[in-house]
Curated annotation (Swiss-Prot):
Residues 90-120 form a coiled coil. Ubiquitinated, leading to its degradation. Decreased phosphorylation levels are associated with the differentiation of intestinal epithelial cells. It is found in: Nucleus; Cytoplasm; Cytoplasm, Cytoskeleton, Spindle. There is a cross-link at residue 347 (Glycyl lysine isopeptide (Lys-Gly) (interchain with G-Cter in SUMO2)). It comes from Homo sapiens (Human). One of its GO terms (cellular component) is nucleus. This is Disks large-associated protein 5. One of its GO terms (biological process) is mitotic spindle organization. Residues 203-225, 269-281, 628-671 have a biased composition (Polar residues). Potential cell cycle regulator that may play a role in carcinogenesis of cancer cells. Mitotic phosphoprotein regulated by the ubiquitin-proteasome pathway. Key regulator of adherens junction integrity and differentiation that may be involved in CDH1-mediated adhesion and signaling in epithelial cells. Residues 153-284, 628-674 are annotated as: Disordered. One of its GO terms (molecular function) is microtubule binding.
Length: 846
């Protein structure tokens, strides 16, 4: 019988070829019947075919003869009724159906006989020994019985009874090894050990042997406990008894409770009597087994030669302390080879542990018959030392335990250690994950509420930003990851989802979430440290924040410029950013040390230097020498583009010129401004000057040349005839010129900080890409000529001030305008000379 027959039959029945074959067969049968009917009809008399049933042939003949009145002899026959004809046809069809059904049954029976029976069922393997109860283990062993050729006679049974009585009277009996006895005596010794329940056997039983076996169940069970004393007993004993495994079932089945109780008593006797057994070197059941077992099964032993040399004894290594020799005994093998069915075997009751010990001993002896059988007949010499060592080991264990635990197997302690190792790695379940999720949610929520309340306090904005970041990230974590994890826990508990979610999956997901939890907790810890330090944010943190803000401003200013050499610009910006950051750090430290110095707001304390492909923003420190007039509120610009557009339109379309002050008013104010600029220039820290010298190696020479430029400014301005021919508007709006002059410095600095688009169009030396259509005006052409002569001045602060001044100022004459412009230009050159660098634009490119 095999599954292939069933599969082929299944395919044969549903195959298209089989269906076609059946249809063709039916057609051939129907054609054959039709041919026969036609043949009968043509012959006009009914010849009965053997293949057609008798009833059908008779009806066909009658139908043919009645339907055709060709024969004169049959003309006087009465026609049959239609109802009768239909009834006969139905009977005929029924008969045909029954015959076909019976044929089908016979055919199926023949096919089944050829094919065999296909059995479907559940495979139930034998339960492991540590899960079997005592009764199941006892009942399962008779199935393993193998018939033995040894026949028990009445004399042998009597010898067995006498031997068991002697074993009951004395626990240990010394037997001297002597010459080998006759074959009958060997067989009788063999039968003495066959009766013991732990040694399975199924011998041919006579009536007297059965009665003897029933009379001594208690004595048999008492001898069981002495069997696993030494390794030699364990190795030699199973050898002759491998093929017989069914005997102990009958003995223990009769009185199992008594057998267990006897084993408890004998176990205590074993521990106390091993010293006497080893002192005589001939314990009961050890040398007798060694004498008799090899001689009984010599034929079987010859077929299984050991790979070890003769008289070789298997011993553990010298360094082993945990197992040593004890695993070779059945009791130690119980714990080593088969796990205990309880997690805490030392806390169980004595009766349960003893029952388990008996079952495990039986199973382990069955196992040992297969593994240690090879060398059982080769260990007669070193038996004494082995037994002595084992006796000492067992006695030491017995002293360490209490009186109530004497019945427990000695080597169940390793099983307890293994169980403890398993307990050390608990398997998390759904309740565990729900509890930890709830606890983490409550903890993080409390953190969020605590820091939300601190946002209402008067703390720096930087600290508030950090608090908002930590709280927001925590709430996002609880909203997203915690909700997702809660859904996975529900899927695991209620078995939902496309794929099954296991506790291992939950454990892995929670490990990932725990990293994010640690991150937000680290942020809260940093906030606590920040609060303890008085909300003083670290310099690195401030530096990073300022750098980010500054980069945003630069990007917004350059967005309208055509992009060329982006890689070079980015590299130059990065290098300059490092230098500027170091400079800011030094200045910030000096500001903290000099508390008496008045500090200008952040909007004013920067000088922006734009060289076309990079931009330098330097802080400015103003001391008490600065006049009060320069500290007035600055006139803020709306947007740089709007100012630029307004100025260019006012110059080109309306013809409004740049207004300057009168000579009387301009002189004192310019002198005062120059004094302010000199003070500012001299008050710059040495560290900043050294850094700027590193940026521009030729800076000292350029500063000296600024004085030459100051002397030639008037001549250059006079030569610009285009600027002198500008029309003037009379009757303009009269403003306070002195106020505008006082606000000049702050307006220049602030306008340059806001955006570089104005500077890009009005600097004296700029790259070609910054020249826009607004430079077509006559005023800016004049400024271009000035830039050709002032090659070393990179920043035109004069035109910056002109753009910031009101275009509607009243003026007396063009000479006053020219003189004021020259004075302002000279003043700003002396003011900004420390920021001169080279420009890639050549004078001939204008």
């Amino acid at each position: 019988m095999s599954s292939s027959h069933f599969a082929s039959r299944h395919r044969k029945d549903i195959s298209t070829e089989m269906i076609r074959t059946k249809i063709a067969h039916r057609k051939s049968l129907s054609q054959k019947e039709n041919r026969h009917k036609e043949y009968e009809r043509n012959r006009h008399f009914g010849l009965k075919d053997v293949n057609i049933p008798t009833l059908e042939g008779r009806i066909l003949v009658e139908l043919d003869e009645t339907s055709q009145g060709l024969v004169p002899e049959k003309t006087n026959v009465k026609p049959r009724a239609m109802k009768t004809i239909l009834g006969d046809q139905r009977k005929q069809m029924l008969q045909k159906y029954k015959e076909e059904k019976q044929l089908q049954k016979l055919k199926e029976q023949r096919e089944k006989a050829k094919r065999g029976i296909f059995k479907v069922g559940r495979y139930r393997p034998d339960m492991p020994c540590f899960l079997l109860s005592n009764q199941n283990a006892v009942k399962a062993e008779p199935k393993k019985a193998i018939p033995s050729s040894v026949r028990i006679t009445r004399s042998k049974a009597k010898d067995q009874m006498e031997q068991t009585k002697i074993d009951n009277e004395s626990d240990v009996r010394a037997i001297r090894p002597g010459p080998r006895q006759t074959s009958e005596k060997k067989v009788s010794d063999k039968e003495k050990k066959v009766v013991q329940p732990v040694m399975p056997t199924s011998l041919r039983m006579t009536r007297s042997a059965t009665q003897a076996a029933k009379q001594v169940p208690r004595t048999v069970s008492s001898t069981t406990a002495r069997k696993p004393v030494t390794r030699a007993a364990n190795e030699n004993e199973p050898e002759g008894k491998v093929p017989s495994k069914g005997r102990p079932a009958k003995n223990v089945e009769t009185k199992p409770d008594k057998g267990i109780s006897c084993k408890v008593d004998s176990e205590e006797n074993t521990l106390n009597s091993q010293t006497n057994a080893t002192s005589g070197m001939n314990p009961d059941g050890v040398l007798s087994k060694m004498e008799n077992l090899p001689e009984i099964n010599t034929a079987k032993i010859k077929g299984k030669n050991s790979f070890a040399p003769k008289d070789f004894m298997f011993q553990p290594l010298d360094g082993l302390k945990t197992y040593q020799v004890t695993p070779m005994t059945p009791r130690s093998a119980n714990a080593f080879l088969t796990p205990s069915y309880t997690w805490t075997p030392l806390k169980t009751e004595v009766d349960e542990s003893q029952a388990t010990k008996e079952i495990l001993a039986q199973k382990c002896k069955t196992y040992s018959t297969k593994t240690i059988q090879q060398d059982s007949n080769k260990l007669p010499c070193p038996l004494g030392p082995l037994t002595v060592w084992h006796e000492e080991h067992v006695l030491n264990k017995n002293e360490a335990t209490t009186k109530n635990l004497n019945g427990l197997p000695i080597k169940e302690v390793p099983s307890l250690e293994r169980n403890e190792g398993r307990i050390a790695q608990p398997h998390h379940g759904v309740p565990y994950f729900r509890n930890i999720l709830q606890s983490e949610t409550e903890k993080l929520t409390s953190h969020c509420f605590e820091w939300d309340r601190k946002l209402e306090l008067d703390i720096p904005d930087d600290a508030k930003d950090l608090i908002r970041t930590a709280v927001g990230q925590t709430r996002l974590l609880m909203k997203e990851r915690f909700k997702q994890f809660e859904g996975l826990v529900d899927d695991c508990e209620y078995k939902r989802g496309i794929k099954e979610t296991t506790c291992t999956d939950l454990d892995g997901f929670w490990d990932m979430v725990s990293f994010q939890i640690e991150d937000v907790i680290h942020k809260f810890n940093n906030l606590i440290k920040l609060e303890e330090s008085g909300w003083q944010v670290n310099n690195n943190m401030n530096h990073n924040m300022n750098k980010n803000v500054f980069r945003k401003k630069v990007v917004s200013g350059i967005a309208s410029k055509p992009k060329q050499d982006d890689a070079g610009r980015i590299a130059a910006r990065n290098r300059l950013a490092a230098i500027k950051n170091a400079m800011r750090e030094r200045i910030r430290q000096e500001e903290c040390a000099e508390t008496a110095v008045s500090v200008i707001p952040k909007e004013v304390d920067k000088i922006v230097f734009d060289a076309g492909f990079f931009r330098v923003e330097s802080p400015v420190k103003l001391f008490s020498g600065l006049s009060v007039s320069s500290e007035g509120p600055s006139q803020r610009l709306g947007t740089p583009k709007s100012v630029n557009k307004a100025v260019s339109q006012s110059r080109n379309e309306m013809g409004i010129p740049q207004q300057t002050t009168s000579p009387e008013n301009a002189g004192p104010q310019n002198t005062k401004s120059e004094h302010v600029k000199k003070t500012l220039f001299l008050s710059i820290p040495e560290s900043r000057s050294s850094i700027e010298d590193a940026q521009c190696p030729g800076l000292p020479d350029l500063i000296e040349e600024n004085h030459v430029v100051n002397k030639t400014d008037l001549k250059v301005d006079c030569l610009s005839s285009e600027r002198m021919s500008l029309p003037l508007l009379a009757g303009g709006v009269a403003d306070d010129i002195n106020t505008n002059k006082k606000e000049g410095i702050s307006d220049v600095v602030e306008g340059m900080e806001l955006n570089s688009s104005i500077t890009s169009q009005d600097v004296l030396m700029s790259s070609p890409e910054k020249n826009t259509a607004s430079q077509n005006s006559i005023l800016e052409e004049g400024e271009t000529k000035i830039s050709q002569s002032e090659l070393f001045d990179n920043k035109s602060l004069t035109t910056e001030c002109h753009l910031l001044d009101s275009p509607g100022l009243n003026c007396s004459n063009p000479f006053t305008q020219l003189e004021r412009r020259h004075q302002e230009h000279a003043r700003h050159i002396s003011f900004g000379g420390n920021l001169i660098t080279f420009s890639p634009l050549q004078p001939g490119e204008f």
